[in-house]
A protein has these predicted regions:
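Active-site gating loop/helix substructures
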Residues: 136-193, 197
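C-terminal functional extensions of proteins
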Residues: 235-344
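Short glycine/serine/threonine-rich phosphate/pyrophosphate-binding segments
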Residues: 19-25, 193, 198-205
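Non-transmembrane, aqueous-exposed alpha-helical and coiled segments at domain scale
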Residues: 2-11, 29, 33, 121, ...
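Gly/lys/ser-thr-rich phosphate-binding loops in alpha/beta enzymes
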Residues: 1-61
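Charged helix-capping and loop-helix junction motifs
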Residues: 203-210, 236-241
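A short helix->loop->beta-strand "cap" motif at the edges of active sites that frequently abuts
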Residues: 32-33, 216-220, 254, 292
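Electropositive, gly/pro-rich neighborhoods at or near active sites that engage anionic ligands
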Residues: 42-161, 313, 317-321, 325-336, ...
Length: 344
């Protein structure tokens, strides 16, 4: 088994899906090359969903985004992100097709990821959380209500409180041992922003991930989402988000929560209001009593518009975190942490 890190640099394991991890990884690679991106493998929407259904391959989309974020070559990044605009490949990113082709030709998704990483010359390691072909299930036992599939769950307007639902992957997966090793060996574990129920939850519920998070000596940081999601996390506060993260992982493991306290400009606020999405509120009284420390700041980043050629239905985030500000904050926290916890 390949070692996710080499010595003598800050070692960071980033846990997440595609968009949230991409944002963080793009800035983090400027500070260290010892990065392990642990990636959700339950995606079945958009281009990824079509390739899974038609080719029987594992989901490439989130893995591609993480690899692209860690590449220093703009030409290769653009190539892997290129989306076809016409023909039978319309809506597909070239990187998704390449990863699926490599998996089919080698018979191994792990080998496909390693080969594509070599092509992109990435700084770091991209680690699928599991190498099993799984689908996401969300179940409210008390209501006898079940939703199946990441795409279905992502688009659903929940009839019941999601905090009373259980998340699971079917069939029950085996954790990728490299993911556990990365969490255990890291100096910092960074849980990236992302959809609670279709991006972060499906990764954290894999047996072995939560145990590793509780066992690690690393500083564990959760970067809270910027906005709520209509029909799913309406009125969720910062502590609500953090509580769900730890529920998925089976117990307490967060040391710091980073959250945004900057308000968007009027135009951006109006665009979000149309989608009934609002800046996540910091419930400061609850935060002051939490077992973790919290750090608020101005973390709003740039607006991202719909990609050209991206015509396969999928949800794309409108705004990103200011990744440079997030990364600087994490490094400052670690400098304080290591002085306070010298044995770690």
């Amino acid at each position: 088994m390949k070692d996710p890190f080499t010595p003598n640099e800050l070692k960071v394991a980033v846990i997440g899906g595609g968009t949230g991890s991409f944002t963080i990884l793009s800035a983090l690679k400027e500070h260290t090359s010892q990065i392990a991106a642990i990636v959700n493998m339950a995606d079945d929407g958009g281009s990824t969903g079509v390739l899974r259904d038609e080719l029987g391959t594992l989901p490439p989309g989130d893995v591609r985004q993480c690899m692209v974020a860690l590449s220093d070559s703009k030409r290769l990044r653009d190539l892997f992100n290129y989306r076809f605009e016409e023909g039978s490949c319309s809506g597909h990113a070239l990187g998704n097709i390449l990863l699926s082709a490599l998996e089919k030709s080698t018979g191994s998704f792990a080998e496909a990821v390693e080969t594509a990483s070599d092509i992109l010359r990435i700084n770091g390691t991209v680690i699928p959380a599991t190498l099993d072909n799984v689908r996401l299930k969300m179940e409210w036992p008390a209501a006898s209500y079940i939703l199946n599939g990441e795409r279905v769950i992502d688009a659903n307007y929940f009839k019941h409180d999601p905090r009373k639902a259980g998340l699971s992957l079917l069939p029950k997966p085996t954790v990728n041992p490299m993911a556990v090793q990365a969490i255990e060996q890291a100096d910092v574990v960074l849980i990236a922003p992302g959809d609670l129920y279709t991006s972060l939850g499906p990764l954290l519920v894999i047996d072995g991930i939560g145990d590793a998070l509780r066992r690690t000596d690393a500083m564990v940081v959760y970067v809270c989402n910027l906005v709520t999601k209509d029909g799913q996390t309406n009125e969720f506060t910062v502590t609500d988000h953090a509580a769900e993260i730890e529920r998925f992982g089976g117990g307490s493991f967060i040391d710091y929560v980073i959250y945004n306290n900057q308000q968007p400009d009027i135009q951006l606020a109006a665009r979000y209001k149309k989608e009934k999405a609002f800046i996540v509120k910091a419930d400061k009284e609850k935060l002051s009593k939490a077992h973790y420390e919290s750090v608020g700041g101005s973390f709003l980043g740039h607006i991202v518009e719909h990609e050209v050629g991206d015509n396969i239905p999928a949800t794309r985030s409108l705004i990103r975190h200011n990744a440079d500000a997030i990364t600087d904050t994490v490094i400052e926290l670690y400098d304080t942490w290591i002085k306070r916890e010298p044995s770690r």
